[in-house]
């Protein structure tokens, strides 16, 4: 029988190995492949069944090694959707509505345009009340909706907070809630077996 601590260490070691492998694969993506894959991903996102009704698109601004989200952000803005991107606030992420000058935002330590600290965030309760399509980053994804992030748990906590806000809103109301659809957003090569 495996001791619980030993099992957790095995899972942690497996996740660490998968993260290392995924980061190496991302670093090997050529600029040409990134551009083609980014345009393809934006086309797939805008063809997703949740896209037409989405009032809000939660996107992320890409690290240089990640799939480029600029094409999907521009498509959402062109479609008249609100777009919000994450900002790290303490140990959590908060989503900030994208400003027209977002490309001029100063870059953070990950070389990502950083939303200004003074920009107001959209509370999870407000997000829960909007038809939302969330494009979630990760290092690896499986076909059942699982994802392996970078290990800080930012998105896990955020998605849990929106789920809690949606549950609370549903308990107060008998009407249907606005849909919230989260999809892993990355390269097809980031899809792994469960």
Describe each region flagged by the PLM.
Residues 2-130:
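N-terminal active-site beta-alpha-beta segment that forms phosphate/nucleotide-binding
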Residues 44, 147-148:
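Short linear sequence motifs
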Residues 1-13, 17, 24-28, 79, ...:
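Surface-exposed, charge/polar-rich loops and edge strands
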